[in-house]
Structures are given as C-alpha cells and as structure tokens.
C-alpha cells in the first residue's frame, strides 16, 4: 500500500505524516529505508530492528566499513563517526555525521547507510524540533537529533550496498538490477 504525503523538508518529516495516516497505536518502532538504498541486505534491516528492540534505543542506523579512501573524500557519501569501533550485532553511539572530506586518522569513521529506525515517541519529538543550523548547512537531517541531544545508535552492516548518490550510481544499480532480473 502506498501512502501519499504532502511536501516536507526531510524524509523523516514525511514518514511521520505517513505513519500518522496509518492510524495505528500498537507500533513501537518505525523504520525509514531511504529510496536511494535499493540494494540494502534484508538481513541488515532485521539486525537493526532486533538491536533497536533489544537495546530499547531511540534512533538506530547502519554503517559499513570504509573499503576505499575515495569514500572519505566523496562529499556525496555520508560518513558517520562513532564513539567505539563497530562490531557485529552491537550498537555504538554516533558522535557525528558528515559529507565533508575526512581523513582516516580517526579509526571510527564508517560509510553511513540510509536507513533509520525510530522509537515512535522519539520520532514524534524529533519532527517537532525546528531544523537546526547544523542540519541545514550539512544537508543531514540526522544532525537534528544529535543537536537536540537524542542519541543515535549505529550498527555494523555486513555488506556495503551501493547507494544512489549520483547519476553514475543510478546507471550502475540499474545494470545490476537488470542482470538480476
């Protein structure tokens, strides 16, 4: 079932409207899988959901190892800096998200994957905050959570899916999907 929404500044604001249209009260978590991540492994989504429930987390997301230094220098790719090294089936706290060029001096820099899981009560709180200067300048809505002292937890994805950040990415994904079908 598709749910149409009005215009919103961010995807998170959009999913909250869609969630409200469901008119349900028995859901604890909402998962926002961004449309530019069509190749994400379903097992990683299940792992994120399980970690959210197990840890009673407010917001969770996924990241993968940085396999190439070019990722660190690509402003189309979002990086996440974590408090601790990511390990399988564990959460660690996100310290920052960035599009900027980063050096690998900090070993806790990962390739962020466009998926978020929200506790419904936290999602409602999040969308009622104004967009922050940091969020607007960096074009990263997750910074609104960090700027308002909401903890974002990060889990390690087993694979690093190709996201669609550029026209070249779109062409590459299209070829992969055509091959698989």
Language-model features: where?
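Conserved beta-strand segments of alpha/beta enzyme cores
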Residues: 1, 93, 151-153
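Short phosphate-binding loop-to-helix
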Residues: 1-33, 37-47
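A short acidic, often aromatic-flanked loop/helix-cap motif at beta-alpha or helix-coil junctions
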Residues: 8-13, 67-68, 103, 161-163
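A general structural signal for well-ordered alpha-helical segments in protein cores
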Residues: 12-15, 45, 94, 123, ...
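Short, high-confidence coil segments that cap the C-terminus of an alpha-helix
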Residues: 24-27, 54-58, 150
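Conserved alpha/beta core of the MobA/IspD/sugar-nucleotide pyrophosphorylase nucleotidyltransferase superfamily
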Residues: 107-181
């Amino acid at each position: 079932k598709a749910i149409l929404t009005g215009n919103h500044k961010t995807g998170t604001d959009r999913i909250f409207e869609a969630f409200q249209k469901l008119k349900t009260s028995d859901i604890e978590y909402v998962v926002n899988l961004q449309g530019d991540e069509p190749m994400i492994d379903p097992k990683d989504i299940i792992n994120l959901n399980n970690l959210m429930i197990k840890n009673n987390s407010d917001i969770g997301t996924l990241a993968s190892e940085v396999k190439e230094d070019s990722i660190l220098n690509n402003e189309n790719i979002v990086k996440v800096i974590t408090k601790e090294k990511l390990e399988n089936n564990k959460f660690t706290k996100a310290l920052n998200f960035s599009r900027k060029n980063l050096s690998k001096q900090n070993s806790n820099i990962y390739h962020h994957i466009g998926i978020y899981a929200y506790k419904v009560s936290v999602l409602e709180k999040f969308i009622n905050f104004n967009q922050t200067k940091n969020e607007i300048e960096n074009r990263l809505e997750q910074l609104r959570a960090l700027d308002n002292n909401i903890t974002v937890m990060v889990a390690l994805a087993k694979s690093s899916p190709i996201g669609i950040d550029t026209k070249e990415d779109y062409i590459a994904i299209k070829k992969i999907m055509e091959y698989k079908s």
